[in-house]
């Protein structure tokens, strides 16, 4: 019986690629970086960012060096990122519709995200989905991060469910899918352009609303 569905945030619920591109374009305009071609600023930022796995203080330090940015420090640019990125947070299609449908089935919702607590919470609130979740675990606050099995078990404990009663949805084949599978959970891989496949996934989806059909299929196995 499926009693809980837990999610990753970036690349799963939050369309980070689109959100980041919107933010970078806005930052380029707001901070009057017109001496740098906007396409160059965007492409170098995205390359240095490495899908979010490089923190922005390092990204900005490198941008300042490479693009000869003057009158702005890395810390000033980072502060701008922390303040303005949430304003550009864009969900994947059918996010809220999917969450509402799951909640209507009396299934608990959880989120497990790697990152800095305040920044991630700002992004979750920007998507206006925080009220749907029964528990949200962010690695900085928890002191552990995915793929550590403990953060998954902690999330399940907070929801009062066992691994066999839960599904984890994520975009990273190792940190999300393989790790959740090792914790004993069913897994759904949110397909993306960063990774070609996720061998440990029980299911794969391109649209979030496909998760509803998977929940129904899992219910059918219980009969």
Would you name each region that the model predicts?
Residues 2-93:
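N-terminal helical cap/lid subdomain that shapes the substrate entry/recognition surface
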Residues 14, 110-111:
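Short catalytic-loop micro-motif centered on adjacent basic/acidic residues
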């Amino acid at each position: 019986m499926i009693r809980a569905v837990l999610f990753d945030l970036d690349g799963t619920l939050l369309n980070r690629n689109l959100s980041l591109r919107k933010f970078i374009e806005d930052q380029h305009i707001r901070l009057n970086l017109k001496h740098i071609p906007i396409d160059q600023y965007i492409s170098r930022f995205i390359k240095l960012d490495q899908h979010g796995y490089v923190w922005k203080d390092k990204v900005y330090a490198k941008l300042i060096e490479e693009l000869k940015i003057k009158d702005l420090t890395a810390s000033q640019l980072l502060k701008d990122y922390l303040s303005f990125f949430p304003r550009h947070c864009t969900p994947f299609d059918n996010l809220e519709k999917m969450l509402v449908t799951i909640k209507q089935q009396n299934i608990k919702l959880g989120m497990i995200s790697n990152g800095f607590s305040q920044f991630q919470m700002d992004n979750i609130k920007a998507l206006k989905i925080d009220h749907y979740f029964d528990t949200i675990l962010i690695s900085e606050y928890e002191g552990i991060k995915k793929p550590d099995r403990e953060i998954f078990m902690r999330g399940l404990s907070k929801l009062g469910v066992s691994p066999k009663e839960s599904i984890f949805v994520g975009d990273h084949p190792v940190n999300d899918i393989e790790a959740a599978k090792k914790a004993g959970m069913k897994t759904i891989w949110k397909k993306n352009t960063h990774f070609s496949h996720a061998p440990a996934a029980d299911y794969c989806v391109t649209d979030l609303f496909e998760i509803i059909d998977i929940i129904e299929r899992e219910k059918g196995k219980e009969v």
